[in-house]
Amino acid sequence: MGKDEYAYVLEYMPFGLPDSKDRKASAIVFTDSLSLLLVALKKDVKVDPGLKVYIGENKRDEVHHIIQRITPDKLSGNGLASLNDRIATIVKENEEKYIDIINKLGSINVRLHSLNLLPGVGKKIVQKILEERTKAKFKSYEDFNERVGFTSDIAKSIEDRIMEELNGEDKYKIFT
């Protein structure tokens, strides 16, 4: 995995965090690694939640520098809602990437398969996924849902799992 180039703005903090000296800040989520960060904005820049900003090595238009990594509990209610929306957008935009991850997931140990970590996936569904994977790799979320007979949407399960990982609720990481 390379360096992240883009991020989505989750919330704008005109006065930064209470424990931060930076005046204008914004909470962002990287589009690739899904890391949450607090960034200082350039002078006279105001950003809106949902805006995709460049944070790579070259000239940045909105972001001055990265202040620190943050956890979802540092976000306001609006920031948390925006995080859920942005994760859904990222999962939708990167369908090929996440289906490829599902096609490659293996066992964690003798008793636990990585697929079991996805919300809504139990032992029977894991067996069905493994069986279908041997026939042919999954090509899309729709293909996965149809072939496995998954009652909920796999994209939603991926979103939920990403949120669990960001909240630090599990020691095993699949997507973050």
Where are these regions (language model features)?
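Conserved hydrophobic/aromatic packing and binding residues within compact polymer-binding modules
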Residues: V126-I129
